[in-house]
Amino acid sequence: MTPNKIILSALLLLLPNLIWAQKQGDSFRAYIYNNTYNVYLRINFYDQDVTVPGQELYGKLPGYLGKLHNSFCWVITSCEVKNEKTAELQLINDFGSEDLTATLTRENDSIYVLKQGAGSTIKVPNNGKWQKLPKTLEFKRK
């Protein structure tokens, strides 16, 4: 075997490990959405540097749940990444009148599931009324 073939073989063997290492830590740095309810999560649980557009008063946060074409949001006030697939969240609505705990789980590379826990039920504006979101809601990565 020539030295060039040895180097090429070594690189090909290491390449999958390098790609996998780059994806580590990206599970909870994403924009994920639910088309059924027109809601989305913009999150970065690692750097916690997300700002809510038009509501910069909150400062940098782990993320928020927003509604398309609406400024209403549920702010993620704190989070704890348990592992690469699970994070626990504390959320509060932008009025400060309701709060809850929730769990966000990454099912695979593109599917996330938000499960509401103790506290209030997430409600979002929809055609002039409040719409309760289901206790378990699936999001897709964009």
Residue spans for each PLM region:
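Central antiparallel beta-sheet cores of small beta-barrel/beta-sandwich binding domains
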Residues: K23-T101, Q116, T121-K142
